[in-house]
């Protein structure tokens, strides 16, 4: 968000992590207790950071994309390989760099997604998977049971693998991916708020 599909197409998940780490360093220097959290790709990034930073108060992950429902996402690795081959053969006209998107929140989401960006998301989640047992801080995993983008089986997998003893999995009966906005979102906000307040009181 905040740049362009073309910009996302040229980025790696390692750059996303570097940006997150810089933000965490700044906030940690200003606050005694920091709770890491994120939605969708941001949830994956938050969990990745939580596995490596043990001084955070806790982490929450909303709709983390461990498993994607979107059929187009399943073809991202093959399309990414095809695009790289076409680059080597100087056949840029044969490349398929973007797929059309019908966002739930058009005011913040792109109308086309870069194949390379989807592939980087998959690389992020692949890198996260073996790190999940290293998360030892309080963890809250939240998911919609009818998410059209993220398969709830993936969030359950995350919850089971997280190493923290203090962990909770909450499944909301909402039929969309973007559960932080719209009808029912106040229930999600309340649950996250309760989690953060509890961690703020802990010493």
Where does each model-flagged region fall?
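Catalytic nucleophile-loop/oxyanion-hole region of alpha/beta-hydrolase
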Residues: 3-30, 35
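Gly/Ala-rich beta-loop-alpha elbow adjacent to hydrolase catalytic centers
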Residues: 38-42, 46
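Active-site nucleophile loop of the alpha/beta-hydrolase fold
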Residues: 60-71
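Active-site nucleophile elbow and catalytic-triad environment of alpha/beta-hydrolase enzymes
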Residues: 114-131, 137
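Short beta-strand/loop motif that positions the catalytic acidic residue
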Residues: 135, 141-143, 147
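Short alpha-helix in the alpha/beta-hydrolase fold that links the catalytic acid
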Residues: 137, 151-160, 171
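Acidic catalytic loop of the alpha/beta-hydrolase fold
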Residues: 146-150, 178
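Catalytic active-site module of serine/aspartate enzymes centered on a nucleophile-bearing elbow/loop
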Residues: 168-203
């Amino acid at each position: 968000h905040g740049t362009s599909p073309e910009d996302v197409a040229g980025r790696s998940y390692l750059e996303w992590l570097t940006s997150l780490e810089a933000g965490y360093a700044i906030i940690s220097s200003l606050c005694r207790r920091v709770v890491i959290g994120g939605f969708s790709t941001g949830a994956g990034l938050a969990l990745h950071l939580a596995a490596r930073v043990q001084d955070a108060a806790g982490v929450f992950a909303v709709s983390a994309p461990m498993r994607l429902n979107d059929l187009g996402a399943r073809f991202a690795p093959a399309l990414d390989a095809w695009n790289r081959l076409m680059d080597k053969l100087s056949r840029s006209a044969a490349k398929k760099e973007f797929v059309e998107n019908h966002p739930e929140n058009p005011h913040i989401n792109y109308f086309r997604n870069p194949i390379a960006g989807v592939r980087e998301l998959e690389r992020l989640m692949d890198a996260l998977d073996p790190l999940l047992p290293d998360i030892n801080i309080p963890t809250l995993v939240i998911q919609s049971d009818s998410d059209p983008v993220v398969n709830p089986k993936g969030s359950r997998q995350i919850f089971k693998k997280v190493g923290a003893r203090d962990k909770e999995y909450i499944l909301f009966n909402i039929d969309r991916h973007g559960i932080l906005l719209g009808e029912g979102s106040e229930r999600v906000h309340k649950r996250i708020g309760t989690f953060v307040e509890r961690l703020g009181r802990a010493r």
